[in-house]
């Protein structure tokens, strides 16, 4: 009897534990409900903030976390999240957004008519002064107390302690600080507006009071370049300059933005392009359109702040291969002020298809960097095709280089561009050139190619003709394949230097071949490619980051190896 009772399990253990199931469901579903509720509340807050942003005179951007200790300019409380103005730098929490416009005006791009144009006072805002800033009165550090304290002028960026702020400072005329020679003062635009009403377009006399050192700067930034780094740069430049000088080229095309040059003195304007080589080419095309319109006197000089990958043109001009925030924006402006003007050759690439009895219009491109046919164009074409399908996957430099490595390795095995010399005829200045067994031909205008490789120079152990980007000459080289390209990039091999020429003509006799102009690839059938000089572009060269390119005076070229 006792054995039978022990062998049978309890009836209760056969049933599922209802409490355990209930607690399991709660532990799984409760975080889901909390996440959904928080997401809904956040969406509602964002809609509410956007409505306020749209009606406000400030240029607000919201953030979930400020990068350094921040205090609300309205209630003076410490805040972790909220909104900040891209133009004047005000920082507020969500609850104080509606009160800001009444108490704190934003930067005025133009003065009101009743203000004296020659006596613009400082525009002070309190709190959140930059780190390592010093009082203009006592020369001691500002912003060192853990509270909303001290003042900053949103035009000249000077800072002053609360206790040092006096009536004389409040009414003192603002001199626009360190970057006065780059800023377009609101008083100037007010005077221009009045002159245009009077149908007077002689702006030279108006600009003379700012001196010969006044070289106003226009910022043209691509907000989509460099994993959207351009968007943050727009705000930083608006704080240091007049917001009217800063443009997002994805919203305002360069040809429209550059019309601001026509309101400024002749031959005085500088432009800083924040983006990749493609954005620079876009801006240079817009400048060419200004020449067609007869606006040669207003043509600006162009500097580059490189974003993204590649950037061979900016590297050639001394601006580096890519900006990742390693130096402050203020230092970028100092570099622009120190830069020297040079010229850059621009070339017309005309592609005429065969077999259409000249009925199809030739395709035309403008080349700043290089043209190529062969393995490097094939890698660019494959990369471009995959990036168009999934752009979000190609935002990392390391990943992009890995993809290029994959396609380069694949081409080493497949050799899709072999026997190029049998498919192409090459003419330099009208003379046909016999080619060895090559897989690619590259036509260079600048010193750098392929993301930082000095292709014409190679390993540097051979004599080679002088190469410049302002002499009206192109350098033409050949490569034996993808593996040869890789060897050249790590300085283990020299390219096959074909020669230099003023005019290059390539005839593709048969089959499809990959081609590219300045990184824009396509697949091309039988055709004739003619490259001729188009124009010069006025660029700015920064000597602080030496690129070893031959762009200085002739005396500096004596040490360069020349062909015998």
Swiss-Prot record:
Q: Native species of this protein? A: Mus musculus
Biological-process GO terms, alphabetical: diacylglycerol metabolic process; lipid phosphorylation; modulation of chemical synaptic transmission; phosphatidic acid biosynthetic process; phosphatidylinositol biosynthetic process; phospholipase C-activating G protein-coupled receptor signaling pathway
**Per the record, what phenotype accompanies loss of this gene's function?**
Homozygous knockout mice are normal, reproduce and behave normally. No gross or histological abnormalities in major organs, including the brain are observed. The phosphatidylinositol 4,5- bisphosphate-signaling pathway in cerebral cortex and long-term potentiation are affected.
Q: What is its main location?
A: membrane
Catalyses: a 1,2-diacyl-sn-glycerol + ATP = a 1,2-diacyl-sn-glycero-3-phosphate + ADP + H(+); 1-hexadecanoyl-2-(5Z,8Z,11Z,14Z-eicosatetraenoyl)-sn-glycerol + ATP = 1-hexadecanoyl-2-(5Z,8Z,11Z,14Z-eicosatetraenoyl)-sn-glycero-3-phosphate + ADP + H(+); 1-octadecanoyl-2-(5Z,8Z,11Z,14Z-eicosatetraenoyl)-sn-glycerol + ATP = 1-octadecanoyl-2-(5Z,8Z,11Z,14Z-eicosatetraenoyl)-sn-glycero-3-phosphate + ADP + H(+); 1-eicosanoyl-2-(5Z,8Z,11Z,14Z)-eicosatetraenoyl-sn-glycerol + ATP = 1-eicosanoyl-2-(5Z,8Z,11Z,14Z)-eicosatetraenoyl-sn-glycero-3-phosphate + ADP + H(+)
The family database entries (Pfam families) matched by this protein are listed as: C1_1, DAGK_acc, DAGK_cat
Recorded topology in the membrane: Single-pass membrane protein
Keyword annotations: ATP-binding, Cytoplasm, Kinase, Lipid metabolism, Membrane, Metal-binding, Nucleotide-binding, Repeat, Transferase, Transmembrane, Transmembrane helix, Zinc, Zinc-finger
Instruction: Respond yes or no to whether keyword Cytoplasm is given for this record.
Output: yes
Q: Which family does it belong to?
A: Belongs to the eukaryotic diacylglycerol kinase family.
Q: Which InterPro entries match?
A: ATP-NAD_kinase_N, C1-like_sf, DGK, Diacylglycerol_kin_accessory, Diacylglycerol_kinase_cat_dom, NAD/diacylglycerol_kinase_sf, PE/DAG-bd
The record's annotation in PROSITE patterns points to: DAGK, ZF_DAG_PE_1, ZF_DAG_PE_2
Q: Specify the protein name.
A: Diacylglycerol kinase epsilon
- Domain DAGKc, which positions? 212-353
